[in-house]
């Protein structure tokens, strides 16, 4: 079954890409965003829905592997509330236009479908004026980001008051040699920082982004890990 993933600039409505594929994966999404970022620069934030590979309602802060890659690039992931696509209304309206033009019905194969998508992107950006843009086209209004895409992930140093811990292959951090706090397998091999708030409460970050709290006083069983909470526990 063919699906399409698009990315667009909220302010100018400029449509960066519309890529057809049979299955949405982290690898495919990362490759497509890399092309976009290399050409147009990186934004300060990205607003998405909660579908894979962008978000997961079961994960801490809804973050996925793709979310953590965005964070490493200095991009803040922002999510619509579950079942509320209207919170990203501009993108949803564009998606409806694209679907009407390219997917009713879809082309006979992915290559032919991509030709349709490419034609839509060109027309949407360069030909079709938008009332919200004073009847200008997105291409006329859009400006490139001043933040270039880094070919290597920038290093990050936690403040000296943080306890820096490597996430294990199963997504946990070892605590006081014997105990475990589960975070997410999406962070395996990466380093998180834990800030001591006193009275056994720790605040956990990945780079400069808050993940959650845990109370070390609640860790009693060496065989059972505890999980982060969004509230102080």
Q: Model-derived features: where do they sit?
A:
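C-terminal, beta-rich DNA-binding module of retroviral/retroelements integrases
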Residues: 125-233
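Short loop/turn microsegments at loop-to-beta-strand junctions
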Residues: 3-5, 199-200
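RNase H-like DDE/DDD metal-dependent nuclease/strand-transfer catalytic core used by mobile genetic elements
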Residues: 1-4, 10-118, 122-123, 214-218
């Amino acid at each position: 079954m063919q699906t399409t993933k698009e990315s667009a600039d909220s302010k100018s409505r400029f449509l960066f890409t519309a890529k057809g594929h049979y299955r949405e994966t982290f690898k495919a999404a990362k490759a497509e965003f890399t092309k976009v970022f290399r050409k147009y620069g990186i934004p300060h934030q990205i607003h998405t829905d909660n579908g894979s590979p962008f978000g997961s309602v079961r994960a801490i802060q809804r973050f996925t592997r793709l979310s953590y890659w965005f964070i490493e690039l200095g991009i803040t992931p922002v999510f619509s509330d579950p079942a509320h696509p209207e919170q990203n209304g501009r993108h949803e309206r564009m998606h409806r236009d694209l679907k009407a033009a390219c997917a009713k019905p879809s082309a006979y194969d992915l290559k032919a479908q991509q030709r349709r998508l490419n034609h839509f992107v060109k027309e949407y950006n360069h030909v079709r004026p938008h009332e919200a843009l004073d009847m200008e086209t997105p291409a006329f209004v859009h400006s490139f980001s001043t933040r270039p895409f880094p070919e290597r992930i920038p290093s990050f140093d936690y403040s000296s008051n943080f306890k820096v811990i490597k996430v294990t292959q199963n997504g946990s951090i070892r605590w006081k040699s014997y105990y475990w706090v589960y975070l997410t397998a999406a962070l395996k091999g990466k380093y998180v920082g834990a800030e001591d708030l006193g009275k056994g409460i720790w605040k956990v970050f990945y780079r400069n982004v808050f993940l959650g709290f845990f109370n070390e006083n609640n860790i009693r069983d060496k065989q059972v890990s505890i999980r982060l909470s969004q509230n102080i526990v």
